[in-house]
Structure formats: C-alpha cells, structure tokens
Amino acid sequence: MTISPQRTIIEALHTKASIDPAEEIRFRIDFLKDYLLYAHAKGFVLGISGGQDSSLAGRLCQLAVEELRAQAGKDDYLFIALRLPYGVQHDEEDAQLALQFIQPDRSYTINIKPAVDGAVEAFEQGTGLTMSDYNKGNQKAQERMTVHYRFAHHFNLLVVGTDHAAEAITGFFTKYGDGGVDISPLTGLTKQQGRELLRHLGAPERIYTKPPTADLLDKRPGQLDEDELGLSYEVIDSYLSGQEISSEAAQKLERRYHITEHKRHLPVTPFDTWWKEQ
C-alpha cells in the first residue's frame, strides 16, 4: 500500500488533527522534567521575542522547573529568559508582556548588535565581499544561539528551541541558529494548537494573535512569516492536520519539506542514507 506524501510527513512530524490542551501541557511539562533529570542539568535557557512560540515554550519551562523544585524540596532548578535584541526592538512592549506572562526565575538582556556587526565587518574586510541582508539575518540567529550556550555552560542549563510542526515542514529556521538547541518541547504542534495551549495557560491575547515574524532582515523589518513563506499558517496547519488543501499549496509544502530535510538531521556521515531516499 502506497502512503501519501502528506501522511508520511504527518507521521514524521508527529502531528495530530486535534488535541486536548490540558493533556498536551501536562505531556510537555513532564517531558521537560524527565529529560532535564536525565541530562543532569539544572534548568533551561530560552530567548524571548514576544511572539507566540517563545512565550509558550518559556511558560512550559518555568512550570517544569517550579514542579521540580517543589518535588525536590530545594531550589536546585531554574529557568532563565533572555532578551537578545539587535539594537532596539520595535516591539519591545510585546517582549515585556511575554516576560510578565512567563514569570521567569531570572531574565537578562544582551544587545547582539555589536557582535553581529563585528562579524559582518570581519567577513567583509577579510573577503572583499558584501554580506547579503539574508546572510546577516542568519548571523543574528546564530549569534543569539551563541549567547544561549554561554548561559547554558555557565549555569549547566539546556538550551530550549521553539520549533513546531509548521516551522519544521517548511524548514523555517536557521541551521545552528534557532535550530541549534538541546530540547524542543513544541515539536508536533501546529501553529493553531500552540495558540490553544497559550489560551489554556491564560496568556494575554496579544501574545497569540500577534502576526508571527522572525524579524531578521534589516531591509524588511517586521516581515511576516507568511509573506516570506508564501503560505498562510492556516493552510500549513490544515495540511498537517490531514485536511485537503489545494494541489498547488500541497506541492509547495512537500517541495519545501524535501529541500530542507538536511535541516532536520545531525551532520551527515558516510553511513547515512536518508538523503538518498528523497
């Protein structure tokens, strides 16, 4: 029996047509707790942008460490939230709203602009080339992850990712940037299901109704994810939930999934075959 590309992708990304928000929250908090204990780490660190995904992941992490502290009877575990703006963030109020919702144990702000600009300048001086705005956007994402790991190493923490199914299918993340993490608690959720979890957790409506943006490009500040993808999250979620969408949209999604497969794997070795099976 031939399995359709849609069914293959749904199974690979562990998506479900519907969820029970309370059960999903419990499942993901328990996952965070169990893996933290397995890794012998002391907590989690995550950058908070003010958007839906980092707000949800951050709140789940905070709840997980609070439960672990209660179970252990001591303050051995913590969650650190990072603000990592490139200069001045135009929607800083949203980031502060997210922090109020998450209530992290600690939060720090580090401006990544000097480090990013220094890396761009060194590249351009050393090569005589001009770094593209897109390449610089990836540099921002990778610098943020570098900062995450400085905190992780200092405090013995796990770096948390915010990748969910709608980003996974499109490869909409920077390799070794926001994709370079230790643990990914939102895996398998569609964008709409993430909103359901935030509503259940009592998040301010602004957090989950705000149009998503990676906001990495200098020349297109605040560019919406959906504009860059050329597909709405509603269409992507429908596909991931097993619903029928237009053949054009399905083909576009399946093509993006295949050409970004390398992003969903560790570095390829001579013994890997997944890349030959596309």
What does each model-found stretch correspond to?
Residues 1-46, 52, 56-60, 220-278:
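Peripheral terminal appendages
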Residues 59, 93, 97, 146, ...:
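Residues on a specific face of well-ordered alpha-helices
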Residues 102, 122-126, 176, 201, ...:
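Alpha-helix boundary/capping residues
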Residues 73, 133-143, 188-195, 231-243:
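Short, basic, helix/turn surface patches
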Residues 70, 107, 206-207, 262:
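Secondary-structure boundary/capping residues
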Residues 75-78, 104, 136, 165-230:
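Catalytic subdomain that performs nucleotidyl-dependent activation
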Residues 2-170:
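ATP-dependent adenylation/nucleotidyltransferase module used to activate substrates
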